[in-house]
A protein has these predicted regions:
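Basic nucleic-acid-binding interfaces
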Residues: 1-137
Length: 137
């Protein structure tokens, strides 16, 4: 993962607001199964990038682990954490279950819960490093 750039810490200018809203999400598949491996993990990453681009969000860090996903993303001030998760999880579930029939064995792809924490610009680099280090554990 690339290091945090100065652009990641810049304020977002929208028509009615100036903001710097970085959210750290952790979300897991149903029953915490080791689902995110190989081609499935690669495709999940592509889907997340598509959703982020379509919604004009910015990925700061993304790590897809076999049992969970870390996503550090800059969002618009009009988008809530629940909206971000709904977009990511629903698109991923729909596409992945069509493209990988083995995932149909799971009653649902995601747990309904997730973790989200807001990240200030001072600690964003720390959170990004933490996410990257998860791969080595």
């Amino acid at each position: 993962m690339a290091s945090l750039s100065k652009k990641d810490l810049e304020y977002r200018h929208e028509s009615n607001a100036v903001s710097l809203i970085n959210m750290h999400f952790v979300f897991i598949p149903k029953r915490r199964k080791a689902v995110w491996v190989g081609k499935i993990a690669e495709r999940l990453q592509e889907i997340i990038f598509e959703v982020v681009t379509e919604n004009r969000w910015k990925i700061i860090a993304l790590e897809i682990m076999p049992h969970h996903v870390h996503l550090l993303v800059n969002v618009k001030p009009t988008d809530s954490a629940s909206f971000v998760m709904q977009r990511v999880k629903s698109r991923a579930s729909s596409y992945l279950r069509k493209e990988f029939p083995e995932l149909l064995k799971l009653p649902t792809l995601w747990t309904p819960s997730y973790f989200v924490g807001s990240v200030g610009n001072v600690s964003t680099e720390t959170v990004r490093k933490y996410i990257e280090e998860q791969r080595d554990k």
